[in-house]
């Protein structure tokens, strides 16, 4: 998400040749954008129908690519401040899903699908949760 691996390069070779980070150049603004994009993926993962899958490191925004760079050691300690913020936000999303019958069992009802916006409802037993994904601003809302 942060551009550490270019679309036109061999991602497998890149993983062998250098360490893949969140961004290629360590630019703080690009890194923040990458974390926001990754968070949108977690929001989608935790609000669409089905069983969410949080894979090794997803909960704190672990960077990676294809083999051999897709299996970093799991961090249980020593997270950066931004990784800890990301982890806390994912924990809040998981807790919200656990406490929301519409997000667990609800029917998926698309409301708006556009180039940079996706709005859908999850409805169960008269209760509705609305999820808005805003790609243009890398933002979301869950009501």
Question: What are the roles of these predicted feature ranges?
Answer:
Residues 1-143:
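Active-site and adjacent substrate-binding regions of carbohydrate-active enzymes
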């Amino acid at each position: 998400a942060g551009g550490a691996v270019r679309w036109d390069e061999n991602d497998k070779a890149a993983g062998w040749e250098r360490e893949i980070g969140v961004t290629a150049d360590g630019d703080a603004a690009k890194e923040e954008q990458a974390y926001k994009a990754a968070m949108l993926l977690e929001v989608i993962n935790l609000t669409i129908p089905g069983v969410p899958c949080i894979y090794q490191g997803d909960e704190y925004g672990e960077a990676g690519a294809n083999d051999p760079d897709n299996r970093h050691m799991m961090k249980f300690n020593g997270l950066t401040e931004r990784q800890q913020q990301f982890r806390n936000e994912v924990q809040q999303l998981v807790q919200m899903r656990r406490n929301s019958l519409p997000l667990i069992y609800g029917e998926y009802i698309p409301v708006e699908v556009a180039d940079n916006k996706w709005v859908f409802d999850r409805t169960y037993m008269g209760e509705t949760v609305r999820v808005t994904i805003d790609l243009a601003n890398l933002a979301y809302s869950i009501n």
